[in-house]
From Swiss-Prot:
HAMAP family documented for this protein: Methyltr_PrmA
One Gene Ontology CC term in the entry: cytoplasm
Compartments in which it is found: Cytoplasm
Gene Ontology MF terms: protein-lysine N-methyltransferase activity
A Pfam match: PrmA
Function: Methylates ribosomal protein L11.
This protein's name: Ribosomal protein L11 methyltransferase
Protein source organism: Desulforapulum autotrophicum (strain ATCC 43914 / DSM 3382 / VKM B-1955 / HRM2) (Desulfobacterium autotrophicum)
Origin superkingdom: Bacteria
Keyword Hydrolase: no
Keywords for this protein: Cytoplasm, Methyltransferase, S-adenosyl-L-methionine, Transferase
Length: 303
């Protein structure tokens, strides 16, 4: 079978929001292999001899099967993209073979050093760890969270900064499980996560096991936080949309142990003050703010 590679380059005043909206079109129309491409520096030397140049513009790409209905589906993509207010989207297509598609998406993923010692390694990239490196083995999949997005990268760095040996850890919106993997390798004790997507729960579990984390040492449930058992945790992490974070702050508050902290990411800068106000209204004290690109991550503790 042949596939149609669809690429959407976009420009907007709020690039973070534009990225979300354009990507949502691709997901809604069930494109395969969706990748968000953002301008980044060239990979560091030693991050894989096969590494290619990083993209120089913001774009979203995905794949459609080359069928009789493909023209109609592409027209639907264009219609939805043209309807986005304040976002200039340029679409392009090319035909690729099955084998080309199976390998081409790998071009966009590299070994990524998140901090001085925290590293994410895709299976097809060569990498020699330095002494003291904590390496997360993770291949991009269906679930959100590969470490390449600013929100995940900030979360990982903050987990490394905030985790203490033996700490109890809860990941709200587990996605790929990358934050749970990091917490486990950084010394967390109790390790739990939840996601409302059953596919993500299954993927996360496999990713943890791939990183040699025993299934007996973690638990991931397909549920929402309001339905999750009322346990107490030393560190609760939520890398999700800002409006969702605001809505679940009372639940996060009730899940924190005395002295516990929450790491909140997935917050577009335009929502920063609203989230901070909601934290104060829900009995939190802001401990730290960090920014990367158009995104903000916060650390808060109980008053």
């Amino acid at each position: 079978m042949k596939w149609i590679h669809v690429n959407a380059r976009f420009e907007a005043d709020d690039m973070a929001l534009a990225e979300e909206l354009v990507a949502q079109i691709f997901f809604d129309l069930d494109l395969k292999g969706v990748v968000c491409e953002v301008p980044l520096p060239e990979p560091d030397e030693g991050f894989g001899s096969n590494a290619l140049a990083q993209p120089d513009t913001h774009s979203i790409s995905g794949y459609l099967p080359d069928l009789s209905t493909s023209d109609l589906l592409f027209a639907d993509i264009k219609k939805k993209a043209d309807a986005l207010k304040g976002i200039n989207v340029t679409l392009s297509t090319r035909i690729v073979d099955d084998q080309d598609w199976a390998e081409s998406w790998k071009d966009f993923f590299f070994v990524t050093r998140i901090t001085d010692t925290l590293v994410i390694r895709p299976s097809w990239r060569e990498f020699e760890p330095k002494p003291g490196d904590v390496v997360i083995d993770l291949d991009p999949g269906m679930a959100f969270g590969t470490g390449t997005h600013e929100t995940t990268a900030m979360c990982l760095a903050l987990v490394q900064e905030q985790i203490t040996p033996g700490a109890s850890f809860l990941d709200v919106g587990t996605g790929s499980g990358i934050l749970m993997i990091a917490a486990a390798k950084l010394g967390a004790g109790t390790l739990k996560g939840l996601d409302n997507d059953e596919a993500a729960v299954q993927i996360a579990g496999k990713n943890l096991e791939h990183n040699r984390i025993s299934p007996q040492s973690f638990e991931i449930r397909c549920t929402t936080l309001d339905r999750y058992p009322h346990e107490k945790f030393d560190l609760v992490v939520a890398n999700i949309l800002a409006e969702v974070i605001i809505s679940i702050l009372p639940e996060i508050h009730s899940r924190l142990a005395p002295g516990g902290r929450a790491i909140l990411s997935g917050i577009i800068i335009a929502w920063e003050e609203r989230v901070k106000t909601a934290l104060e209204d829900n009995g939190f004290t802001l401990v730290k703010t960090t920014t990367q690109g158009e995104w903000v991550a916060l650390v808060a503790e109980l008053v």
